[in-house]
């Protein structure tokens, strides 16, 4: 969406002269994935993770540019990375749709710019935006707009320039995830829940288009902290207990179920709120939203035992764990050297790298 500069916007190139690297940046880590084109399609190359110290990035804002530059410079040297596609923090992005009447419309970008302040709480001169035409008829255009504060994107551009890594594209994390886990040209509507360490992204995609995204300050670390406090053990022991028992009612330690259930129910309520809002509110013009076919889970903590079953029963809808290889053509011939559990943490990086293979 945001191509290699905070001032220029171009589509992702449909050709590729070498490997495609996706770089997923968060407060805790930088994950990278390399995808390689070969005669049978696309195959997984290198992948890995680098820790990001606390305080370097907070709520999507880079607080320590020099430290992040050091991490990226080291990654470039160790992995010989030259260019990447990079995720942008959803906490700092505004996503909305507007309808533009064709009568008198001369410049789409200018028309959007004039209406920005009706949709975001930031002056138009202090932001960067890009847009996508969703559909149109004889009289109007339906346009989706993504907006990010200029100072945020400028910091990301600067750290990559200083580390010597070229950026093909800056893209919303949720859009990258959708590219990885939703089959190409799938017309249905899905809710995607990215359950991470410190936060959870909730998105809705319809006909391959990201329609909505929101971030909740609730992640797997909170569940671990609850176990730590309830059982008076250290964090590492609590994390092991969470992974071993999860939400299994039949586990040998039933106390963990009730402890975790309180935390997970908070997440369930947030998911349900967005689920109901989508189904009870109509599109502009009075048309009903298409129904959500199922909820798809990804992110490192979506591996929690019993989570899909709990959400499915409590929300009375189908819930399943994502398949991040659904759009990688060689997976049936050769299983990627990455476990399914591990792959759920790499959904964003894989989706970013896939962007260079879009027609």
Residue ranges and their predicted role:
Residues 1-359:
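Hydrophobic/aromatic-enriched cytosolic interaction surfaces used to assemble or bind macromolecules
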């Amino acid at each position: 969406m945001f191509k290699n500069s905070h001032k220029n916007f171009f589509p992702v190139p449909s050709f590729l002269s070498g490997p495609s690297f996706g770089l997923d940046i968060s407060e805790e880590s930088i994950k990278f994935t390399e995808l390689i084109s070969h005669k049978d399609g696309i195959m997984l190359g290198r992948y890995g993770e680098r820790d990001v110290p606390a305080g370097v990035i907070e709520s999507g804002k880079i607080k320590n540019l020099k430290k992040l530059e050091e991490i990226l410079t080291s990654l470039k040297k160790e992995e010989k990375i030259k260019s990447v596609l990079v995720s942008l923090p959803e906490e700092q992005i505004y996503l909305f749709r507007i309808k533009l009447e064709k009568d008198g419309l001369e410049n789409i970008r200018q028309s959007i710019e004039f209406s920005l302040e009706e949709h975001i709480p930031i002056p138009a001169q202090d932001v960067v935006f890009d847009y996508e035409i969703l559909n149109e008829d004889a009289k109007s255009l339906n346009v989706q707009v993504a907006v990010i504060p200029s100072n945020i994107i400028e910091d990301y551009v600067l750290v990559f320039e200083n580390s010597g890594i070229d950026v093909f594209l800056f893209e919303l994390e949720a859009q990258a995830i959708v590219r990885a886990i939703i089959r190409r040209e799938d017309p249905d509507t899905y809710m995607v829940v990215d359950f991470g360490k410190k936060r959870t992204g909730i998105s809705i995609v319809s006909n391959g288009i990201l329609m909505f995204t929101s971030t909740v300050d609730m992640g797997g670390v909170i569940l671990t902290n609850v176990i730590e406090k309830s059982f008076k053990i250290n964090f590492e022991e609590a994390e092991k207990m969470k992974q071993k028992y999860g939400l299994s009612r039949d586990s040998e330690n039933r106390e963990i179920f009730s402890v975790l259930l309180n935390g997970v129910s908070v997440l369930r309520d947030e998911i349900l709120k967005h689920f109901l809002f989508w189904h009870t509110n109509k599109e502009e013009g009075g048309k009903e939203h298409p129904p959500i076919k199922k909820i798809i889970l990804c992110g490192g903590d979506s591996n929690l035992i019993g989570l899909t079953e709990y959400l499915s029963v409590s929300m009375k809808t189908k819930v399943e764990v994502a398949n991040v290889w659904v759009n990688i053509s060689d997976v049936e011939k050769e299983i990627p050297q990455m476990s399914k559990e591990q792959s759920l943490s790499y959904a964003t990086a894989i989706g970013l790298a896939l962007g260079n293979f879009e027609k």
